[in-house]
From Swiss-Prot:
Family matches, as Pfam families: HLH (PF00010), Myc_N (PF01056)
Quaternary data: Efficient DNA binding requires dimerization with another bHLH protein. Binds DNA as a heterodimer with max.
Skewed-composition ranges (Basic and acidic residues): 290-306
Segments of skewed composition (Acidic residues): 187-197
PROSITE patterns hit by this protein: BHLH
This protein's name: Protein L-Myc-1a
Tissue note: Uterus.
UniProt KW Transferase keyword: no
Recorded superkingdom: Eukaryota
Keyword tags: DNA-binding, Nucleus
Region (Disordered): 172-226, 243-306
SMART domains (alphabetical): HLH
Organismal lineage: Eukaryota, Metazoa, Chordata, Craniata, Vertebrata
């Protein structure tokens, strides 16, 4: 298999990474894969400096709508802190080439070997170091002469919107008529630091209930736990000792009619008849009469049953004097007494037949004596 030839394509000058025959004298594991050198790509150029301080008047103070919200960009730390610590330069001196530096820093190098990376790193750091030295000298000269920063120098600044076009939504919500004030400057999760004041005013307490006390409480919420800009909300909370016997203060006055006792329901329905067409006085009267008739029949049945048991108890010889006999005992004793009555009735019927036969015999004897 022949070696990979990289002299064609886009004219890149790259070395061979795969070879036909592996040299046994050289350690194969000393070579590093392209993915292992990815962190060295960040050492090519320093991270772009922070935005200049807004000390001028006019439109240069707010290049983008986000600056009007009091947005302060977080401090960007470079990967090579030692390099930045040794060279402190003025951002105003390199604004002429700021766009190209940002674009070059965002685009990673396509070289894959450590040898080429070191060459590019040394080649790029040399002009940057010279530029930093020149900017330091110019800054010292301005400080000695006391020349203030003019608008022409600030005009050389590159707007972040020109390099990174990121739309920032800007929306304000007007305050409502209920007395609550709400200010929302952006709908994104990572929006700027906002402070929303919510004030609840209750001027008319409900009838028969003590006025509730509302205390404003500040709550700090951070959408990003590692973000430097938490959100503060002023919320009016309702603090009241719970009384479970009293109705809830948030319920409507119409709900009080639903917890009335059942005995007062006919009067409420009859009084609210003109407002609701479904309930009428005739319907309520018919329901009341039906319920009264049912109750009357039930009471009459119970009274009749009680009187019957009392009468039955009086007929039984052994239970006539006891007033606390149960119904089961009364029924049992009544059954036994009834059986006794039936047996005595049969015995008396037999005696009656015998007496009647004897009577017939005596009548025939009397008639025979008369004929003789």
């Amino acid at each position: 298999m022949p070696g990979v030839n990289t002299q064609t394509l886009y004219g890149w000058d790259m070395e061979h990474y795969f070879y036909d025959e592996m040299d046994t004298e050289e350690d194969f594991f000393k070579s590093t894969a392209p993915s292992e050198d990815i962190w060295k790509k960040f050492e090519l150029l320093p991270t772009p400096p922070m935005s200049p301080s807004r000390t001028l008047d006019g439109d240069w103070l707010f290049p983008i709508p986000g600056d009007r919200l009091g947005w302060a960009p977080p401090k960007v730390l470079t990967c090579d802190e030692e390099y930045e610590g040794l060279h402190k330069f003025d951002p105003l001196d390199i604004f002429g080439n700021l766009g190209s530096i940002v674009i070059k820093d965002c685009m990673w190098s396509g070289l894959s070997t450590s040898h080429r990376l070191e060459k590019v790193a040394h080649g790029e750091r040399a002009p940057v170091a010279a530029l930093i030295q020149n900017s330091t000298a110019q800054k010292a000269a301005r400080a000695a002469s006391g020349t203030p920063v003019t608008g022409s120098q600030a005009a050389q600044c590159v707007s972040p919107a020109a390099v990174l076009e990121l739309p920032v939504p800007h929306k304000k919500v007007a305050a409502g008529s209920s007395g609550s004030e709400c200010r929302s400057d952006s709908s994104d999760d990572d929006e700027d630091d906002d402070e929303i004041d919510v004030v609840t005013v209750d001027n008319r307490p409900k009838r028969g209930r003590p006025p509730s006390r509302r205390t404003p409480v500040t709550i700090t919420v951070s959408a990003d736990p590692f973000g430097p800009c938490p959100k503060r909300f002023h919320v009016s909370l309702h603090r009241q000792q719970h009384n479970y016997a009293a109705p809830s203060p948030d319920t409507d006055p119409e709900d009080d009619f639903e917890i009335e006792p059942v005995s007062k329901r006919p009067r409420l329905e009859s009084s609210s008849a003109p407002s609701s067409p479904l309930s009428s006085p005739a319907t309520s009267d018919s329901e009341d009469s039906t319920e009264q008739r049912r109750n009357f029949l039930e009471r009459k049945r119970r009274d009749d049953l009680r009187s019957r048991f009392q009468a039955l108890r009086e007929e039984i010889p052994g239970l006539s004097g006891s007033s606390k006999t149960s119904k089961v005992a009364i029924l049992t004793q009544a059954t036994d007494y009834l059986l006794q009555l039936h047996s005595s009735q049969r015995r008396q019927a037999q005696e009656k037949r015998k007496l009647k036969a004897k009577q017939q015999q005596l009548l025939r004897r009397i008639s025979a004596l008369q004929n003789s």
